Every structure is written in C-alpha cells, then in structure tokens.
Amino acid sequence: MIRYLVSVPVLIGVVVVANHHIGFSRGVLWGFVAWEFVHLAGGLIPMGTDHILYNADSVVPLVRWDRLVHASGFGVATAASWQAIRSFLPAGQGVPVGVAFLAALCALGLGAVIEIFEFLITLFVSTNVGGYADTGWDLVFDLLGASAVALWLARNRRPLDARARSRT
C-alpha cells in the first residue's frame, strides 16, 4: 500500500509535467489513466484470502495480471516516447522508422528504472513484489508491449503537421 502512496502521485506528476511540454494525444493520456487503473487494481483487489490480483495464478501459465499490465503499460510508454521525440522534429517531415525503435528503447529504459525503484523499496519495506524471476518476467513483458507498439508506429507513421507541433 505504501508503494502506491508514493508511486501514484509521482507518476501523475511526471505525466502532467511531460504533457505540459509535449502535449500528448488524448489516446496516450487515456492510456496512462487506464495503465494506472489496472496497476492499482492489481495491487488492491483481493483474490482469496492470501493473494491479490497481481500474484493470483492464471489459466495460462505465463500470463498473469502483472505481466499484462507491464506489456500494455510499456506499450503506452512507447507511444508517449514516440510523441515526445516527434515534438522535436520539424513539422511536415516524415518520421523515420528508427524513431519507433528509439521510442521503444526509451520505454524500456523507463521500465528498468521502475524495476530498480521496486528493488530499492524491498530493501526497506516488505512488499508483494517478487524476486529476480519476477523482475525478469516484468522486463520481458515490457519488451513485448514496447515492441508491439513500436512495430505498429513504424508501420503507421505519419508526418507531423503544424497543428500538432503548435501544442508543444
């Protein structure tokens, strides 16, 4: 619970400040809202007497709530990174495919920072955060979500128009 009391306001603050400078699309902003909602649900919804949604077993062995949250969340982070990078490019110019790859790398860097933060918290407070295997699976699903969105962005890239540029 303490993890949420610290992390949620920090993440909201980061998104608000970034949005002020970048001007994220409504889709990305709603993606952040949905990501935080499913993240909170995973940590707060009880499943039986000694589990929460995050660590409850699933019908599909490798697919758990936490991993789906990581895949979808870092897909959103990739889209946000894409929009941040595009905000620095000249209006009317096509966006190189490599920018989608760079956006995925930015999202994966964020995922690594979050895993470091989770590790540091476990040094001081008992949490439901798993051990090294959980961290590894989190990073794998971060990669899957970031890669899926990066591939979609690379395939559907459009030139940045002057209206989108003026929001920054």
Task: Put a short name on every predicted segment.
Residues 2-6, 23-37:
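Cytoplasmic-side transmembrane-helix entry/capping segments in multi-pass membrane proteins
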Residues 2-5, 61-83, 136-144:
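Membrane-interface loop-to-helix entry segments
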Residues 49-53, 65, 111-147:
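Interfacial helix-loop-helix junctions of multi-pass membrane proteins
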